[in-house]
């Protein structure tokens, strides 16, 4: 199924009351919607078949026209981070597609800035009023990825820089030297992730998120694959 099913509010973590009605978790709609749009955009880039781009744009436009916010409990930060960067990357792949009306693309940019970016920034700055090391690394990393991706697709160097600065020197476990917290070099050429003591799935999620961050930065001429004497490589 290549259709998407946008929701007015992306809800993650707990049911919420919106306009007098209880709305349960529905974040899977955003996860699927962003993934579908990205895969369609990628197929367009690879095969140069406008049918894929047209469907991806149709799906993204539906989200822009429908979704006005991200909510829930503290897990709202995961929704904003994960789906924020995924939607942004899909849009970036499609920005050269001539069939995307410039006004619709502008609306998409503004949508990212209104719906996802404020939640990304709030987590990186305030982290729900907890100790700055309270949340696992993937929470910080996904919000860094979203901040950087949104900065790129909206042509906002200031937002891009916010994400990069946090990745280098931020206070949360999303900072690279905290996400990869134990470095065995120079004796051994490997390093250990902050999430390694949790489980394999979340540890590999961190690997994937840092890979996304590094590739986003690479597209802008910044090399974080080799940053800090190849720290990411040692973590892999």
Please annotate each region the language model reported:
Residues 1-129, 141, 145, 165-168, ...:
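Extracellular glycan-targeting catalytic surfaces
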Residues 79, 104, 108-111, 131-142, ...:
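Short, contiguous, pocket-lining structural segments
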Residues 51-52, 204-207:
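Short, functional N-terminal and low-complexity linear motifs
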Residues 146-202:
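Aromatic-anchored, glycine/proline-accented short structural segments
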Residues 72-76, 134, 179-181:
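Acidic, Ser/Thr-rich low-complexity linear motifs
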């Amino acid at each position: 199924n290549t259709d998407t099913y946008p929701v007015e509010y992306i809800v993650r973590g707990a049911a919420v009351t919106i306009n007098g009605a209880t709305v349960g978790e529905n974040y899977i709609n955003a996860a699927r919607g962003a993934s579908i749009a990205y895969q369609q955009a990628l197929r367009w880039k690879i095969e140069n078949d406008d049918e894929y781009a047209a469907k991806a744009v149709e799906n993204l436009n539906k989200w822009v026209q429908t979704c006005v916010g991200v909510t829930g409990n503290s897990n709202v930060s995961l929704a904003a981070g994960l789906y924020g960067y995924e939607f942004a990357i899909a849009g970036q792949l499609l920005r050269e597609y001539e069939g995307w009306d410039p006004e619709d693309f502008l609306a998409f940019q503004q949508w990212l800035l209104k719906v996802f970016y404020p939640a990304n920034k709030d987590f990186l700055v305030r982290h729900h009023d907890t100790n700055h090391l309270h949340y696992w690394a993937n929470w910080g990393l996904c919000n860094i990825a979203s901040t950087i991706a949104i900065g790129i697709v909206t042509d906002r160097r200031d937002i891009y820089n916010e994400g990069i600065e946090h990745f280098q020197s931020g206070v949360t476990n999303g900072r690279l030297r905290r996400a990869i917290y134990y470095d065995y070099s120079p004796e051994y050429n490997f390093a250990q992730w902050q999430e390694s003591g949790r489980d394999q799935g979340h540890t590999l999620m961190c690997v994937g998120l840092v890979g996304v961050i590094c590739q986003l930065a690479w597209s802008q001429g910044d090399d974080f694959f080799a940053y800090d004497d190849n720290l990411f490589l040692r973590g892999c």
